[in-house]
């Protein structure tokens, strides 16, 4: 939490109007026991409370990429929930990750996110004074229909906080983000976890890093690299309209068999 607060304060001091953090800001772990020890209900979560106060102090919009939260699920599964915090410290929007990362990247890297987290069921478009924001999380990135629906509903910015695996990240992260930006004519902002996240006995997982900002025409505007820190980028929202006028594909859907 202290590291996150330091980065948020640095971004605010640099003049950021919208600040974003990665997926599972309050703790990235594959251990169910550690998750149960770390996670709290939304109303009791210390990270949510502290970052909401920080947004209010700085008068900034803050997207908490996501938090792992306890739920009332009978099977004990958690929520993976993104929050958009307004400058008054209030929660402007919530989004629960829809698509669960149930994959076998290799013989030694197997993930079954749905065993620990319940999937969301609702797309979320948030309205702010500067833009309409479509909220997504990590593995959602591989499902373009979600992004198309958000763009057709009016999204100008799409957020993709993530903890992308280092193998899939190296192969697919930038290409997928650029594709979603090009397909929708939206800015795509993707704050990402980076580095090695240790578990017990020296085991753990490695995330890809490379927080990216992508323009509606597909250009990468900023790349945060693999070191923890703050990446700043200026967005000209008129570029959304320009890209969509050049390629108005959001209005060209056709039914087919």
Residue ranges, per PLM feature:
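Small-residue-enriched flexible segments
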Residues: 71, 126, 254-256
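Active-site catalytic loop in hydrolytic enzyme cores
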Residues: 73-153, 166-175, 179, 246-249
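A conserved C-terminal secondary-structure "cap"
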Residues: 240-257
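CN hydrolase (nitrilase-like) catalytic-core segments centered on the catalytic cysteine
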Residues: 42-64, 132, 138-231
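Short helix-loop capping/hinge motifs at secondary-structure junctions, enriched
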Residues: 90-93, 219-221, 241-242
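Cys-nucleophile CN-hydrolase/nitrilase-fold catalytic domain and related Cys-dependent amidase chemistry
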Residues: 1-2, 6-88, 92-96, 165-183
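Short beta-strand scaffold segments in enzyme catalytic cores
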Residues: 64-66, 81-84, 124-126, 211-213, ...
């Amino acid at each position: 939490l202290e590291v996150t607060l330091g980065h948020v304060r640095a971004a605010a001091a640099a003049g950021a109007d919208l600040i974003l953090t990665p997926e599972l800001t309050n703790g990235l772990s594959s251990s169910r026991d550690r998750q149960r020890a770390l996670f709290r209900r939304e109303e009791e979560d210390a990270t949510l409370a502290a970052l909401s106060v920080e947004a209010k102090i700085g008068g900034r919009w803050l997207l908490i990429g996501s938090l792992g939260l306890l739920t009332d699920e009978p099977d004990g599964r958690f929520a993976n929930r993104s929050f958009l915090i307004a400058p008054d410290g209030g929660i402007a929007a919530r989004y629960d990750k829809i698509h669960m990362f149930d994959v076998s990247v290799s013989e030694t890297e197997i993930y079954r996110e749905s065993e620990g987290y319940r999937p969301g069921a609702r797309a979320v478009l948030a309205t702010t004074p500067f833009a309409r924001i479509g909220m997504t999380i990590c593995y959602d990135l591989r499902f373009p229909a979600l992004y198309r629906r958000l763009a057709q509903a009016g999204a100008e910015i799409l957020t993709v906080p993530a903890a992308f695996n280092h193998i899939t990240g190296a192969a697919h992260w930038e290409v997928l983000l650029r594709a979603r930006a090009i397909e929708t004519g939206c800015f795509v902002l993707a704050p990402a976890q980076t580095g090695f996240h240790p578990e017990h006995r020296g085991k753990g997982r490695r995330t890809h890093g490379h927080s990216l900002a992508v323009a509606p025409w597909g250009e990468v505007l900023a790349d945060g690299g693999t070191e923890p820190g703050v990446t700043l980028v200026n967005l000209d929202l008129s570029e959304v309209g320009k890209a969509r006028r050049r390629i108005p594909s959001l209005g060209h859907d056709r039914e087919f068999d």
